Amino acid sequence: MDLVSDLERIFHPRGVAIIGASNRPGNLGGFFLGGFLQQGYDRDQLYAVHPTEKEVSGVKAYPAMQAIPHNVDLALVFSPCDSVKGVVADCVAKGVKGVIICTSGFAENGGDGIKLQGEIAGIARAGGVRIIGPNCVGVYCPESKLINYAGWMPRESGPVGMFSHSGSMTVSMPVAASIMGIHFSKVISCGNECDLNAADFLEYFGRDPKTGIVIGYVEGIKDGRRFFRIAREVSKNKPILLWKGGTSDIGSRSAASHTGALAVKTQVWDAVCKQAGIIKVDCEDDMLDYLQAFYYLPRPRGNRVAIVSATGGLGVAMADACSDYGLELAALSQSTRNRLQGIVPSIGTCVNNPVDIGMMSSFNLQMGIDTVRALAQDEGVDIIIKTVGTSNLEMVSKEFEALAGFDKPMIYIFSRAMMALLKELKPVKGVAIYSTGRRAVQVMSKMLEYERYRSGK
C-alpha cells in the first residue's frame, strides 16, 4: 500500500457511502449526510445505506453496500459497534478504498472492545482497505467538499493540515482559525487508530504539496520512534505545532478512557519534541497564536526587536518580556534615529528603542506608517512590535496595507477590548495581531526556536 495514494483516495473519493444514515431525528449518519449536501458535495456521488430507508435527505438509499450499482471509494460507518465487523467485510467485498468508522465502543472501552477492534483491523488489512478510526468524526477537505461533522465548516482551502485525537477540535480549530483568515487543506480525526495513525498522517502532510504547516492534538503516540523520525524530516521544511493532552495524572487517565492512549512522561515528551524540531503547544490559545505567526509572518532572521508604543510604560513592559524570552532590543542606527526625529513630535516622545511616538500618534496615520517603515529598513532590526492606540479600524487597515511586503515580522498589539473587532479587519500577509506584548514576544521566541532547529544551530 502506498500511504499517499491511500489517503488521496480518502480525501478525493469517487463515491461516498454513508452507512447507517437515516431520516430519524438525531441520527448522526443522517446529520453528516446533510452536512455533505450543505457543503455542495455532488449528491449523485453520495449513497445512503440503510436496511429500510428508501432515501435520506433526498439521497437514494440502498439496503446494503453490494446493492449500490456504482463505484464507492469511501465509506463512513455509523452502524452499532456489534455490526461494524460485518460492515467492514461488506466494504472489502465492494472494493471500497477507505473506511471511516465513526462508531464508538471499541478499544477505548477495553476488554471485548479491544478484541473487536483488532478483528476489524485484520479484515480491512487482508482486503487492502485503509481505516480511519474507530471512535472518530471523520475528515475535512474543503477542496473536495468532504466535511467532518457540520455543513457550516469553512469552505475555503488553505495550507494548514491537522490531525487530532479530539473530534471536537477538528471542528473548533478550523472555525476559530477562519476568523483570522487562516484556512486548512485537510483535517483528520484520528480516533482509536486501529489502522492509520498519527505517524501516517504526519508523513502524509509532510509529502502533501498543499500543506505547508502541520498542527496536531494527541493524547498518546502508538509508534513513537516512527512518529518522531518522520517529524525530524518534516520539520526541516514545514513547522509542526503539537499539543499533547493528558500530561497530568488526571488528564492521562481521561486520555486512556477517551481514545485508549498510553501515558508518556512530560519530561520525555518535551525532550523528544525538541530533538525533532516540534513546536510544543500547551493550550488552544497557544495553537492559534503560533499558527497565526507561521501563517502570516516571514521567518525572523534574528532576535533583535524594535518596539513602538504610544506610551513609555508599554514599551518598558515589552522590553522586560523580550529579556524573559531571550530576545534583544535592537540598537537603532544613527540614521534611523535621525529619520524618527523628523517623523515624531519633539515633546513627549523618544526615538531610542523602545520608540515612544506619543499619544497623538493614535490620530496620525502617516506617523505610524513612517515610523514602522523606518524601523523595517534598519539592518539592525529583525522584528517589529507596535502597540495600537486607536480604535479606528479603517486607519489600522490602511497602515497594514501600506506596510505589506516587508520581509520582517510585524506584530501589532491590540487591547483586549479591540480584539473582539478583529473579524472586521482584513488580514494582511506579513502582519500578526496579539492582545499583549508578552504574548507576541513568546510567539516570536517559538519562531526563533524553530529557525534554530532548521539551521542546525
List the predicted regions and their residue ranges:
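Catalytic-core regions of core metabolic enzymes
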Residues: 1-457
